[in-house]
Amino acid sequence: MSKIIIISNRLPVTVKRKGKSLEYIESIGGLTTGLKSYHEKADSIWAGWPGISDEDISSRQKKNIEKKLKEDYDCIPVFLSDEEIDQYYYGFCNKTIWPLFHYFSSETEYDPEKWEAYKEVNQKFFEKIKPSISRNDTIWVHDYQLMLLPSLIKQAYPSTKVGFFLHIPFPSFEIFRLLVWREEILEGLLGADLIGFHTYDYVRHFLSSTRRLLGLEDKLNVISYEDKYVRVDSFPMGIDYERFTGEYDEKSLAPEVLQINEIKETKTILSIDRLDYSKGIPERIKAFARFLQEYPQYKEKVRLNLIVAPSRVE
């Protein structure tokens, strides 16, 4: 029977040490929020890093984690060492891909050792999921940490359907061409049968890069690549609306709801983001201050609430 295999850098559940024991807590982030409800309802398994270094746990604890995640969460953990976490995740992913794809080229680092770590970890993810792959499965790879994985899967399992979704912008060709390993990244992504982005602008940027860097032709968002066709399209990501509307009636929210309702004739602007330079948080504050300066009649009638989550810290 065919199944869906979701693969992302992080699992929807994070494993942490608590004294001599381990605790399992829900992961936070846009990817987890967007996919968790789907995973719970679908016949799927989810592979990813559980958030704890394999150097912090014993072999016995590893087996216990694997058993717990499989039985309770339908998840497969991919364990990473401290060096892999530092070089692959905090290194290449967050110091090369993240700033460049967000147009912060001056913040981008190009380190061959971190690139090698990125390749090795993508290979490690592939080796971990290989025993779970069947011919008719659908494999859904997510985000910039695993852009080489679609090609690794497709080369080993040509008949398996592979999808990829990028949760961050795909930059214009003028920016993407600055990446030293640009061709390898494109070839890794083109292992997928379907590549998804948030907006059509990102689709257009990707197609432009495949044309100008790899010499590939496309028609109606379909690329002819090697012996197959790759469809590229935009799929704006949503949320589980029913889940969040149901939360509104929870008693834990009542005090906050009542407090907001007591503020008569006041509009509230709500901003929720990670504390990251790409989110434009200082610019939002400056923009709101300028708004009040230019339209003083809105003072005490419009309020800006900022909720800022810690940025990628363990």
Describe the role of every protein-language-model region.
Residues 1-314:
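Catalytic cores of carbohydrate-active enzymes across secretory and cytosolic contexts
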